A protein has these predicted regions:
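Aromatic-Pro/Gly-enriched surface loop or interdomain linker
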Residues: 22-87, 94, 194-195, 202-204, ...
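Charged, often glycine-rich, active-site loop that binds/positions anionic groups
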Residues: 84-92, 159-166
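Active-site-proximal beta-strand/loop segments in catalytic clefts of secreted hydrolases
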Residues: 40-42, 90-93, 120-123, 150-152, ...
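N-terminal secretory signal peptides and thylakoid transit peptides that target proteins
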Residues: 1-18
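Alpha-helical scaffolding within the catalytic cores
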Residues: 72-77, 100-106, 172-174
Length: 252
């Protein structure tokens, strides 16, 4: 992996003077420079799409030059270990209890220091269930940075593949929602169950049907996942920094 792709991780570790640095374990296994999805543990059903995260990490390595560990590592939201991981997945089905004040403060610090959060409504909810709980907590974590629609010309739609929407297992909402810190999307939120489209069983079969678009929609969901991972890894992505030659090849 290039030094540029490590920018966000380095910022997190370099900025985390207020929390312990816990990188010895990662260094010992040669993992520090590899992409590993972290998963937010909360009081609800947070662990429904671990196979999807492992799969998107595998797809990221297969389709790009990013080195990965195809795993999904759960952490409490109050854990200082979050700061070792530039990408944090926060998914769930149904409502979940309020985060503690310590969890809210740690997640705010993580995002402020350069961490990235992908939220994913596994239940496809809108106004209730996971959606209601997540919006409630984001209003606590980033009260001055509300979720808003991400325009289709945002760099996340062209960070690797050229896309114009963000389908998942479902297509309830064609747009992503995002919370901006300056010019950076610190949070992206899908109500389409992105990881549900990625998930495979141990036998290798996809776990869930994709609706309404079937397998072409699943491929778009995988491409969107790769775009999001690439965006999460590159702190300084600009419109002119996208992989234009690869886009021109991959868009066909």
């Amino acid at each position: 992996m290039s030094a540029r792709r490590l920018t966000r991780r380095n910022l997190l570790l370099g900025s985390a003077a207020l929390v312990p640095l816990l990188s010895r374990r990662a260094d010992a296994f040669g993992e520090k420079s590899r992409f590993i999805p972290a998963v937010a543990r909360h009081g609800g059903r947070w662990d429904l799409r671990l196979s999807g995260l492992r799969r998107i990490a595998w797809e990221l390595q297969r389709r790009t030059s990013v080195e990965v560990v195809p795993d999904a590592r759960p952490f409490a939201l109050g854990s200082p270990e979050l700061f070792e991981y530039p990408f944090l997945y926060f998914g769930g089905e149904g409502s979940f209890p309020a985060l503690t004040e310590a969890e809210v403060a740690n997640l705010r610090r993580y995002l402020t220091y350069g961490g990235f959060l992908l939220a994913d409504a596994n239940d496809g909810s809108d106004g209730d269930g996971f959606d209601s709980s997540f919006r409630r907590e984001m209003a606590r974590v980033l009260p001055q940075n509300p979720l808003a629609p991400v325009p289709s010309n945002h760099v996340v739609f062209k960070s690797f593949f050229l896309l114009d929407s963000a389908p998942g297992r479902l297509l309830n909402k064609p747009q992503l929602m995002g919370a901006m810190l300056g010019k950076r999307a610190a949070v992206l939120y899908s109500q389409n169950d992105l990881a549900g489209a990625w998930s495979r069983s141990e036998s290798g079969d996809y776990e869930f049907d994709v609706s309404p678009g079937g397998e072409p929609q699943r491929e778009l969901a995988v491409r969107m996942g790769i775009n999001i991972c690439m965006y999460a890894l590159c702190l300084d992505y600009k419109d002119d920094a996208v992989h234009l030659p690869l886009i021109l090849n991959k868009r066909r």
